[in-house]
Amino acid sequence: MQDRNLIDVNLTSEMKTSFIDYAMSVIVARALPDVRDGLKPVHRRILYGMNELGVTPDKPHKKSARITGDVMGKYHPHGDSSIYEAMVRMAQWWSYRHMLVDGHGNFGSMDGDGAAAQRYTEARMSKIALELLRDINKNTVNFQDNYDGSEREPVVLPARFPNLLVNGATGIAVGMATNIPPHNLAESIDAVKMVMEHPDCTTRELMEVIPGPDFPTGALVMGRSGIHRAYDTGKGSIVLRSRTEIETTQTGRERIVVTEFPYGVNKTKVHEHIVRLAQEKRLEGITAVRDESSREGVRFVIEIRREASATVILNNLFKLTSLQTNFSFNMLAIENGVPKILSLRQIIDNYISHQKEVIIRRTRFDKDKAEARAHILEGLLIALDHLDEVIAIIRNSETDVIAQTELMSRFDLSERQSQAILDMRLRRLTGLERDKIQSEYDDLLALIADLSDILAKPERIITIIKEEMDEIKRKYANPRRTELMVGEVLSLEDEDLIEEEDVLITLSNKGYIKRLAQDEFRAQKRGGRGVQGTGVNNDDFVRELVSTSTHDTLLFFTNFGRVYRLKAYEIPEYGRTAKGLPIVNLLKLEDGETIQTIINARKEETAGKSFFFTTKQGIVKRTEVSEFNNIRQNGLRALKLKEGDQLINVLLTSGQDDIIIGTHSGYSVRFNEASIRNMGRSATGVRGVKLREDDRVVGASRIQDNQEVLVITENGFGKRTSATDYPTKGRGGKGIKTANITPKNGQLAGLVTVDGTEDIMVITNKGVIIRTNVANISQTGRATLGVKIMKLDADAKIVTFTLVQPEDSSIAEINTDRENSISKNKDN
């Protein structure tokens, strides 16, 4: 026999239907707040239950278990733990901007400590919570049956202040979640008033009175663009940063003191995280972490090692720990029974509509009550005006029903009026009592007229809402706790996490680069160039040495006419004897592309200056440094090269420097760079020297009359000549002889200007490296053969040379003044 209680259903359709029902139940009845009062059902039921229980601010606290049990039994049959946890949260100053529950006992801490069991704690409503329920007994909101029909509960509270904005909301439903930040009470009320006064106001205008969230734990909001986006769309993200200060102890050491944490951050977990970072050596320089918080406020201390930078450590803490967090807006709330993501303006509009309805319903309630009372008083006045006749009717009636009927018939009274006359005490028959009744009746008529006027004039309703909110603002508002920082500081750059210190950057002839701590040497002039025993292999040497800061930007110019950029801290640090890292691991160089020049692009040293480019085919170009402010990761074209041409070097010039260019066939030309106008990056340039057939440029330098011109030929001959022997002429000429080229000495391998104290590193086509001091090379005239400076094998030729600091000179002798950071040798 088939059981009639069993119903066959399709599992798929039943799952869909049941899950949708479950999801909507969670969304509407549990997890999301109502846009009108900003409360989820559990919070609304707790507050209403406490109000019905009489646990108001003027009454003693009651056991939390009593409140929880009452709410669970009457309104919220979902377990006592969820009710108690919701009530506890409403009593925590770090959770609610304005607490709705006044807790007595252990209600937890911002360190993550849980509240004591509900049998130990007590609670009552806070004063401001009464404003959410004010006038609830005046038919201001709709009521509905509770879960079993035994009680009635409000669908929404009157909410005389915009609680959804003031205290925010968080909740996870099925397939959706809400995250609305708390705001300042005064600012929220002002925003509501602005919309009522100026219905066309924009989000930007609203932000003039409600500039952003105001979290109970304070802290800093970095930037305002995220706030505007969230207010405009209901979604967005902001950066919250702890309020910190750096103190200096009596012993001169620094410490970081945190006085405010971002909203929702667990102080104990931050403490544990910092200790773990220090132990794992991911964050160095921290010696101790202490929580010195007390009743006076939060004080979280991070002790710093003496030689460490507190600023750098703090920036690392912001990046690695919850001292800086993101708050993601998702302003989802129930609007007309439907979950919806709302903008700030929509939240305010919904609140205003709710308040209008509350005021209208309250006014109607008061008007109906006043009219009912006036109706009674009107009957009493009629009776007093005909007192003798009324008394006679009553005395002559056998029953009160007959008396009531006679009164209604004789004086055209209603049933309620006639009953009030019968219930009237004899003492009210005095003349004095009549005057009181008349006075009350007149007052009621005036009140009824006023209430009718309110209902007839929407502008009066708006005025009442504003006046009552102003009173709440006066009583409960307090200063903003969260500071809104101007500007966008939404992320920390790597530079913020690196301590600024002086370093040396070296590049070897074979393309190995490394960073060395400045204390590897005693001193080094910024922008200087040279070498000092850096331990590279015998077949390699340091060709470029730049003294700089870890925060400085270095520009790398290549033979292909491209320029790349690196921050000094991006170059790996090695010991003095280490080989370093191939430059191709840091820069995306093409096959055959090599670094010709490294220049420190520190702004104060390059401001107003130009880069002077010289190519193998004698083309020169001058371009302002500012043209190279934005260089992509894969480099940028510094100048346009003709086919077969290559960039020889780049000089940093003032715009008025003399330049000398030397050619392979032994000629040179000297001219002032002012004869060349500044050109853009994409320009090719102009002729700097007119080359003879099969000739090419082998060197270019800035030149001053107190310097010397050093030339070295392929067969190992060299000479120094005074710069005064090279007259300044126009650019583009064939030049004058700088060396007498013969088969004996060979063609020119290179030309530089020197001061006479430098060393040179000479490289042959066999890979042999020879080092000598410039002072060992004879000083002769311009058009001379030169002298033999080194012996070469029969088939060996010198292919290039470079200047370096002399081995027997101390780098400590080099001036470290930042203002003179570009050494003369840097541009040679």
UniProtKB/Swiss-Prot annotation:
A motif (GyrA-box) lies at residues 524-530. One of its GO terms (biological process) is DNA topological change. PANTHER family: DNA GYRASE SUBUNIT A, CHLOROPLASTIC_MITOCHONDRIAL, DNA GYRASE/TOPOISOMERASE SUBUNIT A. Signal peptide: none annotated. Belongs to the type II topoisomerase GyrA/ParC subunit family. Its main location: cytoplasm. Few gyrases are as efficient as E.coli at forming negative supercoils. Not all organisms have 2 type II topoisomerases; in organisms with a single type II topoisomerase this enzyme also has to decatenate newly replicated chromosomes. The active site is at Y120 (o-(5'-phospho-dna)-tyrosine intermediate). It is found in: Cytoplasm. Its EC number is 5.6.2.2. One of its GO terms (molecular function) is ATP binding. Residues 32-497 form the Topo IIA-type catalytic domain. It catalyses: ATP-dependent breakage, passage and rejoining of double-stranded DNA. One of its GO terms (cellular component) is chromosome. This is DNA gyrase subunit A. Pfam families: DNA_gyraseA_C, DNA_topoisoIV. Gene3D superfamilies: 3.30.1360.40, DNA gyrase/topoisomerase IV, subunit A, C-terminal, Topoisomerase II, domain 5, Topoisomerase, domain 3.
